[in-house]
Amino acid sequence: MTRYIFVTGGVVSSLGKGIASASLAAILEARGLKVTILKLDPYINVDPGTMSPFQHGEVFVTEDGAETDLDLGHYERFIRTKMTQGNNFTTGRVYEHVLRKERRGDYLGGTVQVIPHITDEIKRRVYEGGDGFDVALVEIGGTVGDIESLPFLEATRQIRSEKGANQAIFMHLTLVPYIKTAGETKTKPTQHSVKELRSIGIQPDILICRSEVELEESERRKIALFTNVEERAVVPLQDADTIYRIPLMLHEHGLDDIICDKLRIEADEVDLAEWVRVLDAKLNPLKSVNIAMVGKYMELLDAYKSLNEALIHAGIQGRVKVNIDYIDSEDIEHHGTERLAGKDAILVPGGFGERGVEGKIATARYARENGVPYLGICLGMQVAVIEYARHVAGWADANSTEFTHDTQHPVVGLITEWVNAEGKIELRDAASDLGGTMRLGGQVCHLKPGTRAHEAYGLDEITERHRHRFEVNNQFVEALESAGLVISGKSADHSLVEMIELPEHPWYVACQFHPEFTSTPRDGHPLFSGFVNAALAYKAARARAQQS
């Protein structure tokens, strides 16, 4: 029998519902429970796949190819359960499904309404997502009071009514602001936020109170009194120096015991040893490296959320502090590569569109010519191939058809056919819709023995997640290999280039997939660990050269 914990947010957005949900899930998992997390997004888009990174941040890709909210990345980094298509759905997807049923005549000519048809579809998806788990946390996007969230809140209210208080509870995350000029915290916003929830029939069972400073017992009592929440269930959550401390903080405040009591769960004693190790390694590094990340969405670093975390994870595995210098590729394009000087390694991440691409190409060239460790991901691999084709193979006009068709050497082109993870052939062309038409999800890659890629993974075959519609053009592969480029990874049917590297370079590796999506703080990822180790080696070699 699945228990449900519905997580809502109030006062302001971006309070960290995703981190709080993931942290609670990590504690419950550490008590021997099988846990999953769902994210319900109120926007009308079917999924975030076509949304601007500046608006939405990163699009996280699941193993089964879903383009989802970045919070699902947090979920996978905190718990062992892998997310799927069913772990994230939007208002747009719900309405799309209901309208499709209406067109088929499934409602027998009835009037289709928000209640019961939309709410019933939301409930169906929640029940389906939680099936087979001991506990399902359900995070509702947005802030209480938003008109877009109302159908989701109504559906969860109905689930609570159907399941009862011992099988479904509400956890509300609020902000308790600290007014520095007055030297005190204010509980009134929390009171009003709970009042808003209660006005639609939801009484929260637990309050997580975010605050810049530690909450006094008197303030917790006051919040409990005015919100009708049990005092011990008013859980303070002070700002932390790292998100990987949050599971330990919530456990210290007894949140998991409160949950188990309210849901009548008999669970094992908690074992958070892995999180203690992660936190110790994060806070007590023995070495440091400086890595330049050259991208095109630097105004919103959430666009690279999983990538940032993957570098931190690699640092945790080796007790290395990874300092990231975020550089806009347009700055490189317009002002040159001076900002790359002195860096221990360079990373070029994915992206879409022509803007800033020449800056990325210049970055790849700088790393190649100066022997600086380089990791290219998705577009980062494509620009490495373009750069190599232009300056080593001698094709000055080499480019990608994503950016121009005016080239004799389109070394990167649109994928028109590939074999998906289920062994089926998928076809695309330039007229295909943008949404949901990329090569998505986990794909098998065969690694070439004796390469740095094979050395990093220690495997002949790997599975990594993809999100792209352009790929290295096979017409030019043989000529590129003759010019010295090594194809170190190929797709399951050996038809697509998945990884490239330069054998004479200290560490120059690029991949078409997104390894950051499978990195976790407890396990890291072999490719990022190899990259950080290469940065350490380069830094040490440079120091020796300066001393001699």
UniProtKB/Swiss-Prot annotation:
- GO CC, alphabetical: cytosol
Q: Which residues bind CTP?
A: S13, D146, I147, E148, K186, T187, K188, P189, T190, Q191, K222
Residues annotated as binding L-glutamine? G351, L379, G380, M381, Q382, E402, R469
Top-level taxon of the source organism: Bacteria
Instruction: Write out the ranges of the annotated region (Amidoligase domain).
Output: 1-265
Q: Which residues form the active site?
A: C378, H514, E516
The residue ranges of the Glutamine amidotransferase type-1 domain are: 290-541
Q: How is its activity regulated?
A: Allosterically activated by GTP, when glutamine is the substrate; GTP has no effect on the reaction when ammonia is the substrate. The allosteric effector GTP functions by stabilizing the protein conformation that binds the tetrahedral intermediate(s) formed during glutamine hydrolysis. Inhibited by the product CTP, via allosteric rather than competitive inhibition.
Name the chemical reaction catalysed here. Answer: UTP + L-glutamine + ATP + H2O = CTP + L-glutamate + ADP + phosphate + 2 H(+); L-glutamine + H2O = L-glutamate + NH4(+); UTP + NH4(+) + ATP = CTP + ADP + phosphate + 2 H(+)
Where are the annotated coiled coils located? none
Pathway(s) it belongs to: Pyrimidine metabolism; CTP biosynthesis via de novo pathway; CTP from UDP: step 2/2
Task: Please cite one Gene Ontology biological process associated with this protein.
Answer: 'de novo' CTP biosynthetic process
Which of the seven top EC classes does this enzyme belong to? ligase
Entry's EC annotation: 6.3.4.2
The UniProt annotation places ATP binding at S14, L15, G16, K17, G18, I19, D71
Q: Which Pfam families match?
A: CTP_synth_N, GATase
Keywords associated with the record = ATP-binding, Glutamine amidotransferase, Ligase, Magnesium, Metal-binding, Nucleotide-binding, Pyrimidine biosynthesis
**A GO MF label:** metal ion binding
Give the residues the record marks as binding UTP. S13, K186, T187, K188, P189, T190, Q191, K222
State the protein's purpose: Catalyzes the ATP-dependent amination of UTP to CTP with either L-glutamine or ammonia as the source of nitrogen. Regulates intracellular CTP levels through interactions with the four ribonucleotide triphosphates.
How this chain assembles, per its entry, is:
Homotetramer.
Among HAMAP family, the record links this protein to:
PyrG
Say which family it is in: Belongs to the CTP synthase family.
Q: What else is known?
A: CTPSs have evolved a hybrid strategy for distinguishing between UTP and CTP. The overlapping regions of the product feedback inhibitory and substrate sites recognize a common feature in both compounds, the triphosphate moiety. To differentiate isosteric substrate and product pyrimidine rings, an additional pocket far from the expected kinase/ligase catalytic site, specifically recognizes the cytosine and ribose portions of the product inhibitor.
Q: Which NCBIfam families match?
A: PRK05380.1 (NF003792), PyrG (TIGR00337)
- Report what the protein is called: CTP synthase
Q: What is the lineage of its organism?
A: Bacteria, Pseudomonadati, Pseudomonadota, Gammaproteobacteria, Oceanospirillales
